[in-house]
Amino acid sequence: MEFWQHIYSNFNVIAFSIFGLKVHWYGIMYVIALLLALLLAKFFVRKFQLDINEKHLDSYFIWVEIGVILGARLGYILIYDANTMYYITHPWQIFNPYINGEFVGIRGMSYHGAIIGFLIATLLFCKKYKTNPWIFLDLVALSVPLAYVFGRIGNFLNQELFGRITNVPWGIYVDGVLRHPSQLYEAFLEGIVVFIIVYLARFKQSFQGELILVYAGAYSLARFICEFYREPDFGIGFVLWGMSMGQILSFIMFITALLVYICIKFKKVNI
């Protein structure tokens, strides 16, 4: 286990360089996640014979990716970043991938911000093309979880979002301190386990939009659990009743998904 515990000391976050441009493993994992999500979406469209045109699907993923990036970055700046006012007064720096002339990529993304950007992009896309947003949302619920696994692996390889201090034998040393590899816990619970739940729910689906609500509930619950092993966000710490900001946002997300599900399922609300 010694090699594993000291993996960060033996691993370079930079995969390779092209003409002086450093390509990080995180970026590679992010691209893999995007491609996998699209491929899975096309697979599920065929498998479940969904009424979605492939050309529309390709366009939709472009819209969604833009929404996700904007939402994730802005969400991080507004919720987590200690330099919020700096970015508000210097908006051109929000997506600046350089620090002191060195390319480091765009760092600082919020999953919950990404969700908001994703929903806005979906609604705008479906309004423009006059399509049912719930069909696309349910498809995303099936396609994203397994792709999400690579995103969390990217966090692990990038040596960020590490866990709390521990003494478990599978912990990893971060700056000389043994910590939980919480990114991998998240990859498993928020990715693989959530996918299994949503996939099984597909065979008992009773209304359009049910899968995205199941996903929201399952993800938020998994994230809430994982936050117990993840180091609270720097500069924020524990926010309320010993909970991290991630747990508070996940709790809100879970309650929202549950209420919408109950209203639709049992109150026969039309969507």
Swiss-Prot record:
A GO MF label: phosphatidylglycerol-prolipoprotein diacylglyceryl transferase activity
Source organism of this protein record: Campylobacter jejuni subsp. jejuni serotype O:2 (strain ATCC 700819 / NCTC 11168)
Pfam families xref list: LGT (PF01790)
Gene field: lgt
Membrane topology, as annotated: Multi-pass membrane protein
Record key words, sorted: Cell inner membrane, Cell membrane, Membrane, Transferase, Transmembrane, Transmembrane helix
Family, as annotated: Belongs to the Lgt family.
Protein name (database record): Phosphatidylglycerol--prolipoprotein diacylglyceryl transferase
EC number: 2.5.1.145
